[in-house]
Amino acid sequence: KEKDKIKKNLKLSTVEGCFWAIMYGGGETFLSACAVFLQFTPFQISFLSAFPPFVGSCFQLFSASIKNKFKDIKHFVVTMSYLQAMLWIVLVILLFYKPTYKYILIWSCIYWTTGTAIQPAWTAWMGYFVPRRIRARYFGKRNRIIGFISFLATLIAGFILDIYNDNM
């Protein structure tokens, strides 16, 4: 029974990682291209690439105390992941209105803050249900799958942007 539960959790973790890979490969890797499309200056683009991750990293100092306001680690990780995913819908809506730099910078700071807030809790959570004896093998396999999905998502997103760019 316990072995089946562990297998199920490991599978779900790999599926979750695949969705993250799609978000990363099909989204995050194109944020600078989005900034170029919006005709931001080179300095604005560099600041947009560097400042939000820095803000997110600083926010990690507070993520543990925020996590403690949730029922458990699982609810914190799931809630923050959901919020981070929903931010992509906000970005798509913003893009329809040709947003100013300020709005993209604010969006990016919130996006990176939610993502980096998740990391310590996610790592602790994985430690609870990935048995030590299989951790290295499991994460090696999981990372290969996620890397491949991220690669595909990046190529597909680039192809879609090429089609969109040709039709403008």
Where are these regions (language model features)?
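Small-residue-rich segments within alpha-helical transmembrane domains of MFS-like 12-TM solute carriers
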Residues: A21, G25, W112-P120
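Glycine-rich segments within core transmembrane alpha-helices of 12-TM secondary carriers
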Residues: P53-Q60, T116, G140-G158
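Transmembrane alpha-helix termini and helix-breaking/packing motifs in multi-pass membrane transporters
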Residues: T29-F37, S65-K69, L91-Y97, S150-M168
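Loop-to-transmembrane helix entry/capping segments in MFS-fold secondary transporters
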Residues: P42-F43, V130-R142
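Helix-loop boundary and gating motifs at the non-cytosolic
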Residues: K1-S63, K67, K74-A85, I89-V92, ...
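Intracellular juxtamembrane helix-capping segments at the cytosolic ends
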Residues: G115-P131
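Hydrophobic/aromatic and small-residue hotspots that mark the transmembrane alpha-helices
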Residues: F62-K67, M126, R135, A157
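C-terminal ends and interior cores of transmembrane alpha-helices
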Residues: V77-P99, L105, F159-I163
